[in-house]
């Protein structure tokens, strides 16, 4: 009986083996430049799962909360909340409070008396959670089995709306943040994180996205009431987007409607936890100022006992654009064209080796240890940066090369080079969105920033339309701004901002030579 039932499956396996064998024989005779003739067996598609297209849906609840979803295959889902919060909104509050909120996530709440209870509930549903703050967004996210969505949303809503803080938990969060602030400068892999924070401070001095995320925090001034006060201003439905990837939209909206009720928040039901006076959230527009931040310090301690050379680091920043700007995609293509990386490539060589930071800098100058371009865009402004690391004696030469790379973009780029940059950017976009947590973050960030979800195909079309004249135009736009400069390590030979400003304004490198 069992054998008779197995016969159809054996026949299917034989048919598949024969098909593979025939295709292999055909493939061996074809040159690599010719596509393989693939059979489209529509019957197998009909019997299996239907192809799943882009089906993002967004619903706005009566209280202003936006809920967005997108279907995916699989038994596991990613859900979470994106909040318009972060260090850019800390003006009026003690600086560093966003990181304190981040460290206090998933602790005691109205329904869970301890962190252990929270994670016990998550374990029942194979769930993992995370909370991260950036300059303009606070992200609470969880991945779990689809049967546990209701329970995990309960955990998320409690940590966002109904947390219970005390002096002990606050002191523990302060210790964690203090340790991270002390530890970051001692870690080689954290240099890029610190440089990114410092270039924002230099580019947007004393305003919005220029407020520091690391170090220089006034944590001693933070009280439990201050944390509740910050949450009462930032954690409002109008500043939130709840998202789910792999969940049914209508059912998810129903779950969110039950759990996300502002009237049941800790600061609403217990107003005594709030301070007497709570500052309003700073909604002012980011003002790019340009500026300089020099951190002349001995980095020898980073090289002791490690196969890592003694390096100095320089970052050149110029005013970029917001992600709502018409030139946003062109700036992204420009970043892809410049590319970059390090002298050591984990996982093997070949990633981005045709980008200009490789071909023009690292391949021609052996003393350049790393060079990379970044495009940081926010709702109202942005900063475009190029970074290089070299031995201290070459750090000013590294700055000259970075400026030269930007200046020569005024002449345009070769068609093949531009086509490669566009293709690589589209490839990164599509491949990253194959990862469920990345798809979730992309979706909620778009709804938070634009109010709707733009499909990747729309961006792919815009990327393909970027021309040489667009690259020249955004380059001129960069060079029209005042530069920002960050130096870290032994930077005694690094020219100052005044010399850099003259070189950029007059399009002449002579001002940077000693």
From Swiss-Prot:
SUPFAM superfamilies: LuxS/MPP-like metallohydrolase. Transmembrane segments: none annotated. Disruption phenotype: RNAi-mediated knockdown causes 63 percent embryonic lethality. Embryonic lethality is further increased in simultaneous RNAi-mediated knockdown of mppa-1 and mppb-1 or ucr-1 and mppa-1. Pfam families: Peptidase_M16, Peptidase_M16_C. GO terms for biological process: protein processing involved in protein targeting to mitochondrion; proteolysis. Residues 1-55 form a transit peptide. It comes from the Eukaryota. Gene3D superfamilies: Metalloenzyme, LuxS/M16 peptidase-like. GO terms for cellular component: mitochondrial processing peptidase complex; mitochondrion. Coiled coil: none annotated. Keywords: Mitochondrion, Transit peptide. It is found in: Mitochondrion matrix. One of its GO terms (molecular function) is metal ion binding. Substrate recognition and binding subunit of the essential mitochondrial processing protease (MPP), which cleaves the mitochondrial sequence off newly imported precursors proteins. Heterodimer of mppa-1 (alpha) and mppb-1 (beta) subunits, forming the mitochondrial processing protease (MPP) in which mppa-1 is involved in substrate recognition and binding and mppb-1 is the catalytic subunit. Belongs to the peptidase M16 family. This is Mitochondrial-processing peptidase subunit alpha. It comes from Caenorhabditis elegans.
């Amino acid at each position: 009986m069992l054998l008779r039932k197995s016969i159809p499956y054996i026949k299917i396996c034989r048919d598949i083996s024969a098909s593979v064998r025939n295709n292999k024989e055909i493939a061996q005779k074809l040159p690599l430049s010719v596509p393989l003739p693939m059979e489209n067996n529509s019957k197998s598609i009909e019997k299996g799962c239907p192809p799943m297209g882009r089906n993002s849906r967004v619903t706005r609840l009566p209280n202003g909360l936006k809920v967005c979803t997108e279907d995916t295959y699989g038994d596991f889902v990613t859900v979470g909340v994106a909040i318009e919060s972060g260090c850019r909104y800390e003006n009026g509050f003690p600086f560093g409070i966003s990181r304190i909120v981040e460290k206090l996530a998933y602790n005691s709440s109205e329904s869970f008396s301890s962190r252990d209870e929270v994670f016990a509930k998550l374990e029942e549903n194979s769930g993992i959670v995370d909370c991260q703050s950036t300059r303009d967004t606070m992200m609470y996210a969880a991945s779990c089995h689809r049967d546990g969505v209701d329970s995990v949303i309960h955990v998320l809503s409690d940590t966002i709306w109904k947390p219970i803080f005390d002096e002990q938990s606050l002191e523990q969060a302060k210790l964690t943040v203090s340790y991270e602030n002390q530890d970051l400068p001692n870690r080689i892999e954290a240099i890029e994180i610190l440089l990114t924070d410092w270039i924002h401070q230099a580019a947007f001095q004393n305003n919005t996205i220029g407020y520091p995320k690391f170090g220089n925090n006034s944590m001693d001034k933070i009280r439990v009431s201050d944390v509740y006060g910050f949450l009462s201003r930032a954690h409002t439905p109008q500043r939130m987007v709840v998202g789910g990837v792999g969940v049914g939209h209508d059912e998810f909206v129903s779950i969110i409607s039950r759990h996300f009720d502002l009237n049941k928040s800790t600061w609403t039901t217990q107003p005594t936890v709030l301070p007497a006076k709570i500052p309003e959230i700073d909604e002012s527009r980011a003002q790019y100022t340009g500026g300089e931040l020099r951190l002349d310090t001995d980095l020898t301690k980073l090289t002791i006992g490690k196969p890592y050379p003694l390096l100095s680091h320089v970052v050149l920043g110029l005013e970029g654009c917001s992600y709502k700007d018409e030139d946003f995609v062109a700036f992204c293509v420009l970043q892809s064209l410049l590319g970059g990386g390090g002298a050591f490539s984990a996982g093997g060589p070949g990633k981005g080796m045709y980008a200009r930071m490789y071909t023009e800098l690292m391949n021609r100058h052996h003393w350049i240890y790393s060079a990379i371009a970044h495009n940081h865009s926010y709702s109202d402004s942005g900063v475009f940066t190029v970074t290089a690391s070299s031995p201290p004696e070459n750090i000013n030469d590294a700055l000259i090369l970075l400026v030269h790379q930007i200046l020569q973009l005024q002449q345009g780029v070769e068609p093949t080079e531009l086509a490669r940059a566009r293709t690589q950017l589209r490839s990164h976009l599509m491949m990253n969105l194959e990862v469920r947590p990345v798809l979730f973050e992309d979706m909620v960030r778009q709804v938070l920033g634009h109010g709707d979800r733009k499909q990747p195909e729309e961006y792919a079309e815009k990327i393909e339309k970027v021309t040489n004249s667009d690259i020249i135009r955004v380059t001129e736009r960069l060079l029209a701004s005042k530069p920002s400069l960050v130096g870290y390590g032994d930077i005694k030979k690094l020219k100052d901002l005044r010399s850099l400003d003259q070189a950029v304004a007059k399009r002449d490198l002579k001002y940077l030579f000693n």
